[in-house]
Design a protein with these regions (language model features):
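RNA-interacting cores
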Residues: 1-175
Length: 175
């Protein structure tokens, strides 16, 4: 299938409010911990950061269903629509669009869980609360992005990316 061609990035770097966040999952954890121990300067080509302090927060209880809905804010736009889903989305009315986006978000979370080696027995519930149902265009690929928040019964690490464009910083969540 379409999703089988992609691997979820195990190391993600986000720059939010002039802070750098490095997220490592599974085999991406140890390299990040090693890196933070000897990090003085980060050079991204167009911007260089001098590193004065690092904090490491490790959690083992992520990527699992929970018995309640957790609220997550989208710190960066969630790129929910690609060319294929975008053309389907455009012909829907607003009520259908909300259901469609809830299903896409659920699929994003299920994909993530499978990538982490988790076989879900429970249903994943999602409820989007977006600032607009009109997607913001993302680059020349005709992708569509949304801002706002969502609720789900799945525990996600802060600053992790969901949706399309993760390697470019899209879809960062905070709950």
């Amino acid at each position: 299938t379409y999703r089988n061609r992609f691997l979820y990035p195990r190391v993600q770097i986000k720059i939010l409010n002039e802070q750098i966040y490095m997220v490592g999952i599974n085999e991406g954890v140890d390299p990040i911990i090693e890196l933070t121990e000897r990090l003085d300067i980060l050079d991204f080509g167009n911007i260089t950061f001098q590193v004065f302090d690092t904090e490491v927060d490790t959690k083992d209880d992520q990527f699992r269903p929970v018995g309640r809905l957790i609220r997550y804010r989208l710190l960066t736009p969630w790129v929910a629509l690609n060319q294929m889903t975008g053309s389907r989305y455009r012909i829907l009315n607003n009520m259908e669009r909300i259901g469609f986006l809830n299903r896409l978000l659920g699929q994003n979370i299920v994909f993530l869980a499978r990538e982490m080696g988790i076989e879900l027995q429970e249903k994943i519930f999602t409820k989007v609360n977006l600032t607009s149902l009109f997607p913001k265009p993302v680059d020349e690929r005709n992708w569509g992005a949304f801002s706002g928040e969502f609720r789900t019964n799945f525990l996600l690490p802060n600053y992790l990316g969901i949706g399309n464009g993760i390697t470019r910083g899209y879809g960062a969540v905070y709950g």
